Amino acid sequence: PFFCNYCNRENSFGLKFRNQSPEYVVDHIQYLHSEYGIEELTFYDDVMTLNRKATMDLMDALHPKKLGFKMSWDAETRVDLVDKELLLAMKEAGCRMMSYGIEHGEFIQEIKGGNATLEQSEKAVKWAHEAKIQTAGYFMIGLPNETPKTIRKTIDFAKKLDCTYATFSITMPFPGNKLYDEAVKSGLIQLDDTWEKFVYGGVGAGGIQAPVLTTESLAASDLEYWTKKAF
């Protein structure tokens, strides 16, 4: 819903947002618990906290006193869609880890939109840690205007945030999103590249994702080097 220029969700799933009711979610969790003994799970929702009221209602329903047992779970959202009260409620409802797509230490506003800023990223991580929730930060390397200097800013910012876990990925411009269109227009992607390269999580030399997009100052080998260095 924020039209992040690197995102492929708009083309894959459309723009319609649908919230499941707390009762619907709890029914599924109760079934998993009673049938399979499941007590840990992950909510695969890119922006779990998009609707704050709905999220708070869900946290109330997931509280161990109402659920009848303690469910440990992980989730992900944007840094500009959390606050202290919300994260504390999530912890009480069993949240173990919150993943944030922070993405970059220089171009965060350009690529994510909304109110996602470096300052807000610091607050989101801090609030989660204060609530005793682990954090995972996702970062991108290899945006069209990327240079060794901007990569270093991203690495330094990731170190400053001190997330529990950090993941660095080479930027993947999926066909159909704004980043891809801009890269093709700028000549940073050759249209005759084989489609098998456009696979999220695809790897190249050394287990690093094979670069599709290169920049004026960074070749594919440079992007692989910096991604390894970031880890």
Region annotations inferred by a language model:
Residues 1-138, 156:
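Radical SAM [4Fe-4S] cluster-binding motif and immediate context
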Residues 14, 50, 89, 118, ...:
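A broad, structure-centric signal for solvent-exposed, well-ordered loop/edge residues
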Residues 18, 144-147:
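Alpha-helix C-terminal capping/termination sites
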Residues 31, 134, 149-152, 156-167, ...:
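C-terminal accessory regions of radical SAM enzymes
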Residues 46-51, 78-79, 140-145, 169-178:
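Short, solvent-exposed turn/loop segments enriched in Gly/Ser/Thr/Pro and often Arg
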Residues 51, 105-107, 121, 147, ...:
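Intrinsic-disorder/low-complexity, polar/charged segments
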